Amino acid sequence: MHCDVLWHNAQLMTLDAAAGGLGIVDDGIVACRHGHIVYAGAAAQAPALQPDTAHDCQRRWISPGLIDCHTHLVYAGNRANEFEQRLRGASYADIAAAGGGIVATVRATRAADDAALLAASLPRLDAMLAEGVTTLEIKSGYGLALDDEIKQLRVARQLGAQRKVEVVPTFLGAHAVPPGEQAQPYIDQVCTQMIPAIAAQGLAEAVDVFCEHLAFSQAQAEQVFIAAQAHGLRIKIHAEQLSNQHGAELAARYGALSADHIEYLDQHGVAAMAAAGTVAVLLPGAFYFTRDTQLPPIAALRTAGVPLALATDCNPGTSPLTSPLLAMNMAATLFRMTVDECIAGFTREAARALGRSERLGQLRAGMDCDLAIWNIDAPADLVYRMGFNPLHARVWRGHPC
């Protein structure tokens, strides 16, 4: 069999769902043709392969490229000053009253043009790519007006054009109530003006809603979901981060790809997610940065068979994190997730959370050839070490980059 590129003398984490766990192969090879994997598995069982190029991995580990399935990467401004203020005793309410918080990011993002937003976002993206990310979701939500939301989504698309990475755009117009507006009239605008325009331009694949007592109600979230489905967009939700608004249960009824945060999720929400196949996206960076104490119900989610994905939640206010490797360590340390769960959370289950499990997140024939090649002794090193980047090479669609 002819192939374009062959990686051999490697140890593999295939993340093959059928095999379960990490799907470890001790003496493995990965063969690629036209950007897709044609074989990934044991060298001893491989068909005869004639590669144009072969790479001796010298016993390095190969995993699927990492997938960050929840980010707010595109924004302008810097809120490090608020971090300092909180350390000195200021409350979130104090900061918001002084014009800070999400309003500060909205103000800066609205003021930035495409070029400025792109320049601000590229270093954050590059930091993720340097740790093996090959696909990431990027949400809007810092424009909170049609033209500015479109601008954010447009820049997200430009990021994907400028780097070898797949960008999955999500419309999060229902992130917060804009300054000077009221929630219901604004949600009406999201549903009747923003969603139709964004869907018509093909700028987003899904919608997201922040369903919380300080943002939007369950009824308002449902209004957004109905509008999204009418325009062919998939559904995600920020749910149960600060209180139990039963948002995850609602989203599951609408077939949501994922429910994210979910610290206050109850058993009814767990059952609804399990029945719908909705992925739990856990965000340990936000939990850490905000010094939260309410743990997501990991044991209940495991028992119910709900897939567990992880993400950085990169954003300027509650998780200024661009390191998936550190997020894995946080998930293990704070949430007591296993090594297998942490690595699967940034590969196989993250692909599921983005509706891409048919072609991303595993090493097997037919999948896109997105790889991360690691200088590690064992998979646990990816989760155990902190401030450590063992990436040897990143491969996107079969091309080293």
UniProtKB/Swiss-Prot annotation:
Cofactor-binding details, from the entry: Binds 1 zinc or iron ion per subunit.
GO biological process: L-histidine catabolic process to glutamate and formamide; L-histidine catabolic process to glutamate and formate
Binding site for Fe(3+): 70, 72, 238, 313
Molecular function per GO: imidazolonepropionase activity; iron ion binding; zinc ion binding
Functional pathway: Amino-acid degradation; L-histidine degradation into L-glutamate; N-formimidoyl-L-glutamate from L-histidine: step 3/3
Matches recorded under Pfam families: Amidohydro_3
Chaperone keyword on record: no
Residue sites binding Zn(2+) per the record: 70, 72, 238, 313
Binding, N-formimidoyl-L-glutamate: 142, 315, 317
Binding site for 4-imidazolone-5-propanoate: 79, 142, 175, 241, 318
EC numbers for this chain: 3.5.2.7
Cofactor(s) in the UniProt record: Zn(2+); Fe(3+)
One cellular-component annotation, GO: cytoplasm
Keywords (A to Z) from UniProt: Cytoplasm, Histidine metabolism, Hydrolase, Iron, Metal-binding, Zinc
Similarity field: Belongs to the metallo-dependent hydrolases superfamily. HutI family.
HAMAP family: HutI
NCBIfam families: hutI
Function: Catalyzes the hydrolytic cleavage of the carbon-nitrogen bond in imidazolone-5-propanoate to yield N-formimidoyl-L-glutamate. It is the third step in the universal histidine degradation pathway.
The protein's name in its UniProt record: Imidazolonepropionase
Organism for this UniProt entry: Xanthomonas axonopodis pv. citri (strain 306)
